[in-house]
Amino acid sequence: MAEKLSEQQIAEFKEAFSLFDKDSDGKITTKELGTVMRSLGQNPSESELTDMINEVDVNSDGSIDFPEFLTMMARKMKDTDSEAEIAEAFKVFDRNGDGKISAAELRHLLTSIGEKLSDADVDQMIKEADTNNDGEIDIQEFTSLLAAK
């Protein structure tokens, strides 16, 4: 995944890595990660820091080296791209821009692409995605729906 990064991105990530790596030993420890996160206004617990490190710590040494950092950043960028795509798709459905997809909006879109569904079918689609039972689909429900596919 890190192989999809440009030379410029890698150089920028090397600079960021150096900011985290306070003692310049080529590794980011939970202590160093915590220091940087706190300086950015975050307040992670020790276990959260350990979890963050373990998520990308391929060689299980309890710290993040630069290749592991690149992998983590490439994943984050990929997630961000797909989040942006999901948000764009959501806007297509959310015609009035109120942050929710109503049955009427879903019905309109499906009709405009040639789908012939009954009101009951559209209501059932909304019901399946509507986890908070407010009769509409919000961005979180929409994202969960797409992630389940």
Swiss-Prot record:
Belongs to the calmodulin family. Calmodulin mediates the control of a large number of enzymes, ion channels and other proteins by Ca(2+). Among the enzymes to be stimulated by the calmodulin-Ca(2+) complex are a number of protein kinases and phosphatases. One of its GO terms (cellular component) is myosin II complex. The keyword Calcium applies. Signal peptide: none annotated. Ca(2+) 4 binds at residues 130, 132, 134, 136, 141. This protein has four functional calcium-binding sites. InterPro entries: CALM/Myosin/TropC-like, EF-hand-dom_pair, EF_Hand_1_Ca_BS, EF_hand_dom. Ca(2+) 2 binds at residues 57, 59, 61, 63, 68. One of its GO terms (molecular function) is calcium ion binding. Keywords: Calcium, Metal-binding, Repeat. It comes from Candida albicans. Residues 8-43, 44-79, 81-116, 117-149 form the EF-hand domain. Coiled coil: none annotated. It comes from the Eukaryota. It holds the Pfam family EF-hand_7. Ca(2+) 3 binds at residues 94, 96, 98, 100, 105. Ca(2+) 1 binds at residues 21, 23, 25, 27, 32. The keyword Cytoplasm does not apply. This is Calmodulin.
